[in-house]
Amino acid sequence: MRRTMTALAAASVLVLAGCATDEPTASPSGTASAAAGSGTGEQSKFFVQADYDNELALLDAAPTGPADKPWEQVLNPKMVDTAKFKKPGKHKICFSNAALNNPWRQVGFKTMQAEVEAQRSRISEFVHVDAEGKDQKQIADINDLLGKKCDALIVSPNTTATLTPAVEAACKAGLPVVVFDRGVNTTCPVTFINPVGGYGFGHVGAEFVSQKMKPGGKLLALRILPGVDVLETRWSAAKIALDKAKVDVVGVEFTDGDPAKTKKIVNDYIQRYGTIDGVWMDAGAVAVAAVEAFQDAGKPVPPMNGEDQLDFLKLWKDKKLTAIAPTYPTYQWRTPIIAALSILDGTQVSNPWKLPQPTITQDNLDRYLDASMPPLHYAMCGCRDLPGYPQRWK
């Protein structure tokens, strides 16, 4: 069902393609948001106090919906009418995807494809376009999809500000638009789907690490890239927790999600400071690389956070790490398909559609370990009941 499409570079996309991008620019040194030894630096321009307060409250909220289907659950639902989008028959669903450039997105997309297969009686065609992590390509992709007679458009934006005009153009074309995973700076989509969010993720990890560190200890913060709302808000919340705990943040570095670069950064800080007492990460894809850097240097692995990637969970168990795994569940990739079909049925959906965001701790770690699945698989896939499990994810 997956179809590869080539983005058009025609005159019709020139207006949007001319927008400035908030993609990170390449830097030989991986310039960070705070220079080494300068603490957490200034608060991110993405920080919104009310959103921060709301997300922290949502961490303790009880969801509505089927108890065994967290991808259908909603936290504090705010229902919106979708009657104007009701259409009979089977539907053509189009998906503009930021990228398939890391294991989290790859696992998520496999989950989405399986959800489409499970809904094949209601979906006539599923069109997927991979923007390859490029803002300008995704802008062109969305413009192209507007001419493909899609019944609904799903968007996972590469970056927040730059993709906003393209999403607004899709809304103006009359398409029901569903945004998920990463947000945009407009309220025009029918719904925005994601778990609790970046503030919740960042807070959980930073609170744990700062509490497990020795007082006044040195912490290294590892980030992936700037300009993506869910990553910026993770750092915003972590900054608040780390500042409050008076942690000595000796560096904030961007890894580009590259294990080799991560190892080099961690090793450089070990060489510079001798001891690093805590590691906070805005995503767990390179958590194993960070652990290995300490092991290679003959240093104890300090308290840290990772994510629900199985290689990290196994290492945590085997090496008895002091760790926590806030999650951004890949089961959220099922929800946009479910939402799009509900909208085309004229059924109310929540906007925003906030999904539960579980945390893996030492107490529940064993529940999420699965030796039968690949190391880069994510425990929160919510995919066990889908067609092709487990082979599709191996």
State where each predicted segment sits.
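C-terminal motif of bacterial Sec signal peptides marking the signal peptidase cleavage site
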Residues: 14-18
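A residue-level marker of the well-folded mature domains of exported/periplasmic proteins
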Residues: 19-394
